[in-house]
Regions:
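Helical scaffold of the NTase/Pol beta-like nucleotidyltransferase catalytic core
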Residues: 1-43
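Active-site nucleotide-donor binding segment shared across nucleotidyl transfer reactions
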Residues: 29-72
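Generic structural hydrophobic/aromatic packing signal, biased to beta-strands
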Residues: 33, 40, 78, 104, ...
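Short, charged/polar surface micro-motifs in flexible loops or helix N-caps
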Residues: 64-69, 111-112, 123-126
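Short amphipathic alpha-helices in soluble, non-transmembrane regions
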Residues: 71-80
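Conserved catalytic core of two-metal-ion nucleotidyltransferases
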Residues: 82-122
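Catalytic cores of NTP-dependent nucleotidyl/adenyl transfer enzymes across multiple folds
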Residues: 115-200
Length: 200
């Protein structure tokens, strides 16, 4: 398998991240949520600079109460205005997560599909700020070497194989994993049972 050098990896990741930022701005998703009084936090790989080849953008959206109608009103506005291909809705209001999940597929002008994970969370609930703290902790521990390792592993994950980014970070920080092959072995014997409880 052809390995990219470190500069290739960084340049490609940076290009993909710049595209993601443009998509985020172009879609106007954050202002759409702010119009219902929500506070929106970017989390995950785009926030930490670890977005590689996946076209995923993660947003955590906070309101004082969870109003299903208000949440749907934002999605209706986005669906009418944007080229959304799929919308998935999960109502977890009555669980300890106290949230509404929206998973949306959006097609950009180049016909690339982007996935927006928008988690609408009640302010003050158990998981308020948890992913934000994890994203910050991961970002703060990144060295150039660790960043390159994580990006290389992400680029080496075969197309069609879904591995949550948090599992890759866990393997690199805790297990000293340095390649996709090592990641596969590590995950077999060191499953990350609750990603929300782990900080690097």
């Amino acid at each position: 398998m052809l390995k990219m050098n470190d500069m290739d990896i960084l340049e490609l990741a940076l290009h993909n991240q710049q595209t993601a930022w443009k998509i985020l701005e172009h879609t106007g998703i954050i202002p759409a949520w702010e119009r219902i009084g929500a506070t929106v936090h970017l989390v995950g790989s785009l926030k930490s600079g670890l977005l590689a080849k996946s076209r995923d953008i993660d947003l955590h959206i906070y309101t004082d109460t969870l109003d299903i109608a208000a949440s749907f009103s934002v999605m209706q506005e986005l669906a009418e205005r944007l080229s959304l291909k799929e919308i998935h809705y999960n109502n977890l209001i009555q669980t300890e997560e106290e949230c509404i999940e929206w998973h949306v597929l959006y097609e950009d002008e180049d016909r690339n599909t982007w996935k927006f994970d928008m988690i609408h969370i009640r302010k003050g609930s158990k998981y308020d700020g948890v992913v934000e703290r994890a994203t910050a902790a991961i970002t703060n521990r990144l060295t150039p070497e660790i960043k390159n390792t994580i990006l290389q592993i992400k680029f080496d994950v075969p197309d069609g194989v879904q591995i949550p980014g948090i599992e890759i970070y866990h393997a690199v920080f805790v297990g000293g994993v340095r390649s996709y092959e090592e990641l596969e072995q590590w995950r077999e014997t060191n499953p990350l049972t609750n990603s929300l409880d782990w900080l690097p």
